[in-house]
């Protein structure tokens, strides 16, 4: 998106198709608060930047690029495994955008694949029964963009409730500025932050 007005139009288009603010935030790689802010047209009144949009379409349009990113993610996982002396049984992809990366990491590391779908309205999400189970597994959680960390926190909580242990979160881009969530280390390929402003 080239401008905030275009971002607003896209958010409004998705809202008119019946998507929730949470679903729109996932689609546009924005925080829920930013989507709410956009849809309220507050951006017309305010001059300050409220969020940073992370667009990774150039990576996602070709499987070869997803594999390249997955190789970097796999390398980070191996580095953390060696540094912190832990093993990994499974790779978990958070729907929708974490799944392609998790699938490739699972393949590259020869680990089971778990698919998790957060529910847009409830606190608990669910694990797809078409993929590996969680119980008794040491799990790396993979997603594309972490804005507030809420989805990752919910995933960690649900993994724990199902008898698994989240040992690491690896994300493409982080807006959070934290190194761990709920005691689980977080590593990202890119970190963003706003410097200065009002």
From Swiss-Prot:
Source superkingdom:
Archaea
- GO terms classed as biological process: pyrimidine nucleobase biosynthetic process; regulation of gene expression; UMP biosynthetic process
Q: Which Gene3D superfamilies match?
A: 3.40.50.2020
Q: Does the keyword Cell membrane apply?
A: no
Keywords, ordered alphabetically: DNA-binding, Transcription, Transcription regulation
Query: What CDD domains does the record point to?
Result: PRTases_typeI
The residues that cross the membrane are none
MF-aspect GO terms: DNA binding; orotate phosphoribosyltransferase activity
Instruction: Answer whether the UniProt record assigns the keyword Transcription to this protein.
Output: yes
Q: Name one Pfam family in it.
A: Pribosyltran
- What's noted about domains in the record? Contains an N-terminal DNA-binding winged helix-turn-helix domain and a C-terminal regulatory domain (or effector binding domain) resembling phosphoribosyltransferase (PRT) domain.
Give the family, as the similarity comment puts it.
Belongs to the purine/pyrimidine phosphoribosyltransferase family. GfcR subfamily.
Q: Which HAMAP family match?
A: GfcR
What is the protein's name according to its record?
Transcriptional regulator GfcR
| Originating organism | Thermoplasma volcanium (strain ATCC 51530 / DSM 4299 / JCM 9571 / NBRC 15438 / GSS1)
């Amino acid at each position: 998106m080239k401008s905030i007005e275009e971002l607003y139009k896209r958010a409004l288009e998705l809202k008119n198709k019946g998507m929730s603010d949470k679903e729109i935030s996932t689609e546009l790689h924005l925080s829920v608060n930013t989507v709410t802010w956009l849809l309220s047209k507050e951006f017309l009144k305010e001059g300050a930047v409220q969020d940073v949009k992370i667009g990774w379409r150039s990576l996602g349009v070709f499987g070869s690029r997803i594999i390249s990113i997955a190789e970097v993610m796999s390398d980070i996982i191996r580095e953390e495994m060696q540094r912190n002396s832990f093993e990994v049984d499974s790779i978990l992809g958070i729907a929708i955008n974490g799944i392609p990366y998790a699938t490739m990491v699972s393949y590259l590391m020869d680990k089971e694949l778990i698919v998790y779908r957060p529910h847009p309205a409830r606190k608990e999400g669910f694990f797809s029964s078409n993929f590996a189970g969680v119980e008794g597994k040491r799990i790396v959680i993979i997603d594309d963009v972490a804005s507030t960390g809420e989805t990752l926190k919910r995933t960690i909580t649900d993994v724990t409730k199902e008898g698994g242990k989240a040992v690491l979160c690896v994300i493409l881009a982080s807006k959070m500025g934290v190194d761990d969530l709920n005691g689980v280390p977080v590593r990202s390929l890119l970190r963003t932050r706003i410097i200065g402003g009002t």
